[in-house]
Amino acid sequence: MKKRKIHHSDDEEDDTFYYRYSSVAAPPPSNPKHQPSSSAKSSAPGGGSGGLAPSKSTLYVSNLDFSLTNSDIHTLFSTFGKVARVTVLKDRHTRQSRGVAFVLYVSREDAAKAARSMDAKILNGRKLTVSIAADNGRASEFIKKRVYKDKSRCYECGDEGHLSYECPKNQLGPRERPPPPKKRGRRKEEEGEAEEISWSAAAPSLAVAEEEFEEENWASVVDNEAGERLRKREAEEEEERRMKRKEKKVSYFSDESDDED
């Protein structure tokens, strides 16, 4: 992986390092008999129809126009596929955009397509940098379904009388609201308690100042149905891996017992 410093115009304080996957594929192993494990196959770029790996379906977008809202970015990138969430980094004091966003797609293929199409494109006079975000292994802290109980004001501008979907600051106009989540009968979920998405694989590159995520209390676009699908697929993958490990362990002890007899 290559470490590079990202400079954003008009943002002198942003001196955080970001990490990305190299665009050059790793050389094949020298031993031809070595067969890659199923987990390695599923984590390879463009890894077929395997399960979702967040580090392969999350885009890192920088040099965005500071006036673009969360909803604007969602509208732009949803043209390439189903977007599960958009997170815009904001200054912790002024609450203004820092020109950086993470866009989580349901499909890694859609994420790759969006990265190819949007990278180096000029938007509002600024040249975008778009790439697949890298893994720093901190999914549980940042990839969360956020639920805001205060529905009296807009989480984009802070004003009352409208929601962020219809915020006047949205340059691309109002956005259709996602369908309300289905209640599952559990009291805590009905009360709106935030539920973590349990990723056992990689997370987006979040080696940025953590306060921006911890204090980001305004704009967060969450497609609830997409989140449900992601959680279900991840749970199925985890169960598959658990069963494979169990089978391998049983086979190993079976061989040992034969030798002893």
From Swiss-Prot:
The keyword NAD does not apply. GO terms for biological process: developmental process; mRNA splicing, via spliceosome; regulation of cell division. A zinc finger (CCHC-type) spans 153-169. It comes from the Eukaryota. It is found in: Nucleus. GO terms for molecular function: RNA binding; zinc ion binding. Residues 18-51, 165-261 are annotated as: Disordered. Disruption phenotype: Embryo lethal when homozygous, and defective for seed maturation when heterozygous. Gene3D superfamilies: 3.30.70.330, Zinc finger, CCHC-type. GO terms for cellular component: nucleus; U12-type spliceosomal complex. Its main location: nucleus. Ubiquitous. Abundantly expressed in the shoot apical neristem. InterPro entries: Nucleotide-bd_a/b_plait_sf, RBD_domain_sf, RRM_dom, ZCRB1, ZCRB1_RRM, Znf_CCHC, Znf_CCHC_sf. Component of the U11/U12 snRNPs that are part of the U12-type spliceosome. This is U11/U12 small nuclear ribonucleoprotein 31 kDa protein. It comes from Arabidopsis thaliana (Mouse-ear cress). The gene is SNRNP31.
